[in-house]
């Protein structure tokens, strides 16, 4: 959690600090990812059980507490898995670089890069579909920016090569995000029928 403010106020310098640290996966998950991933889960739980999804046409879909809780647990697990998958993707893509970082370092990097996406979950307190999409898009752009800033120093490569690596990673990340969003829509939109 100590890097959250720095990722927004001075991201270039903060990425260099993160790269110099030798944080373990367990420490990173317990002190950053588990807490940050809880933000969208808790906000979505409150928003969908107390206010309900607003589709903009006056239709509101409210979930029961039990359904909301079951879906929140699934949503949380999917987000934690998403960070692990992206860490693995970065590690796999870096296989041909002479200074290949460890899998643990790649997962830590992926967790910090995902911070804007986690924080964008605050908007789920008022689950208006177009507002969630807008805030999520802005968060995705900033996540891409953090990726472009961090990859060159993370892999010790030049900015041109970093741009290529970051673009590939971002493309895979967007694909993973789309899968997560599809699962989220299915779980939060239709999950009440499953539970």
Swiss-Prot record:
Residues 56-64, 131-134, 193-195 are periplasmic. Its main location: membrane. The keyword Transmembrane helix applies. GO terms for cellular component: plasma membrane. It comes from Escherichia coli (strain K12). This is Inner membrane protein YohC. Pfam families: Yip1. It comes from the Bacteria. It is found in: Cell inner membrane. GO terms for biological process: DNA damage response. The chain crosses the membrane at residues 33-55, 65-87, 108-130, 135-157, 170-192. Keywords: Cell inner membrane, Cell membrane, Membrane, Transmembrane, Transmembrane helix. Residues 1-32, 88-107, 158-169 are cytoplasmic. It is a multi-pass membrane protein. The gene is yohC.
